[in-house]
Amino acid sequence: MSSRAEELILSLAKDLVGEDATELLKFLLRKRIEMTDDDIAKELNVKVNEIRKKLYLLSEQGFITYRKTRDKETGLFIYYWKVNIDQINELLLNRKRLVLEKLKARYEQEKDSLYYYCPQDNIQYNFDEALENEFKCPKCGSPLEYYDSEKTKKFLEYKIKQIENEIERETRHGSNSR
């Protein structure tokens, strides 16, 4: 796994499960092997109950997976945890699709609207807001200036195309590897 992919995974994990569980995911990514919760707790010098909470959280979000076996002596279940690479790739792909959807919506909004901004406060207003305030900044009273959103539209077009290409490439790559 590339360091860029790992960064994306950890960033997504931080958003979904918080910093502590993300540190555990980082540990498991480095290990690249199946480990029991007891082994993880020993290596990290953390109580096994704390490790289990984080493991369950990571598992709920699809970052890790486990298999369980029964200990022949005690009859208790032993859980072996590992990073779920296939699921993580799907999570990243879905996140990119969501970002793409938002960028397309923003592009349509930019395309279909006129904007004005206050040069003093650098606050942007759509046409209706500007008209309602008689083309004056409601905060400072300065006259609003027309905002040419051409650069914004070009940037959004570029990012949309870039993400569409990434999704297509990763979808094609993913379907070839299965």
Swiss-Prot record:
Domain remark from Swiss-Prot or TrEMBL:
The winged helix domain is involved in binding to DNA in the preinitiation complex.
Which organism encodes this protein?
A: Sulfurisphaera tokodaii (strain DSM 16993 / JCM 10545 / NBRC 100140 / 7)
Q: Which Pfam families does this one have?
A: TFIIE_alpha
Q: What does this protein do?
A: Transcription factor that plays a role in the activation of archaeal genes transcribed by RNA polymerase. Facilitates transcription initiation by enhancing TATA-box recognition by TATA-box-binding protein (Tbp), and transcription factor B (Tfb) and RNA polymerase recruitment. Not absolutely required for transcription in vitro, but particularly important in cases where Tbp or Tfb function is not optimal. It dynamically alters the nucleic acid-binding properties of RNA polymerases by stabilizing the initiation complex and destabilizing elongation complexes.
- List the SUPFAM superfamilies hit by this protein, alphabetically: Winged helix' DNA-binding domain
Q: What does the entry give for GO biological process?
A: regulation of DNA-templated transcription; transcription initiation at RNA polymerase II promoter
Q: Which Gene3D superfamilies match?
A: Winged helix-like DNA-binding domain superfamily/Winged helix DNA-binding domain
Family, according to the entry, reads as follows: Belongs to the TFE family.
Q: Which domain of life is it from?
A: Archaea
**Sequence ranges assigned to domain HTH TFE/IIEalpha-type in this UniProt record:** 5-89
Subunit (UniProt): Monomer. Interaction with RNA polymerase subunits RpoF and RpoE is necessary for Tfe stimulatory transcription activity. Able to interact with Tbp and RNA polymerase in the absence of DNA promoter. Interacts both with the preinitiation and elongation complexes.
Q: Name one GO molecular function term.
A: DNA binding
* SMART domains to which the protein is assigned, alphabetical: TFIIE (SM00531)
Q: Does the keyword Hydrolase apply?
A: no
Indicate what this protein is called per its UniProt record. Transcription factor E
Sorted UniProt keywords: DNA-binding, Transcription, Transcription regulation
Q: Which PROSITE patterns match?
A: HTH_TFE_IIE
